[in-house]
Amino acid sequence: ALGAALEAEFIDIFTDVGGIMTADPRVVEDAQILLKTTYNEICNLAQQGAKVIHPRAVEIAMQYNIPIRVRSTFSEFSGTLITNQSEIDEQRSGGNASSLTGITQTSNIAQFTINSDLTYSLQNELFSKLEEAHISLDLINITQQAVGFTVKTDTADKVSSILDTLELKYSKRSDVAKISLVGAAMTGVPGVVNKVVNTLYSKEIPILQTTDSHTTIWVLVPEECSTNAIRALHQAFELHKPITH
């Protein structure tokens, strides 16, 4: 906000790391520093768990079109440049096989699947009660046979109580993690989801649920498999290769 008020040419954010990385280096040893990426991608990464920068800071910079440089306090390295101008097209033409920018993980998630025959009025009552209880839902999946969603584990007991009150049949799983794969370059690219599925199945990692948007794919996996899932996907999309442009 200060950079926007001062009409700054750049906003420099100094941290204890060299820039924004393709994954958490504590989980993936060969995670790479992103040299240049877009506001939207970093916003998505931050919202999905990346800790280096707050999503609101990126939103303000994007609103005023001010590039952000995320750099280390202890190095002269240029770090990560966040701007409207992405190098994704150049990376594609240069043979970079990755259509992803980064991978993050969110833990402490509970998954609910409601198997009762839900009429429209019952669905409406359910979601109204969840809203009244200030329970935020994620990964919502509604079909004719079932309704599924995830919540933070600290609200799972409240959800169970509401479902019990409505006398709904449901299953709950509390030991799950959400893997988020972010990348503007995967928009319209065939085979991305197939690669995700094949990579996880090849490592015998169960996929509990998936959903996607234009720039993000979310995969729900058992918590105990999350580290192996991130490492396998990071390798499969070649995010471990040094970024040179």
Please name every model-derived segment.
Residues 1-212, 216-245:
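C-terminal catalytic "cap/lid" subdomain
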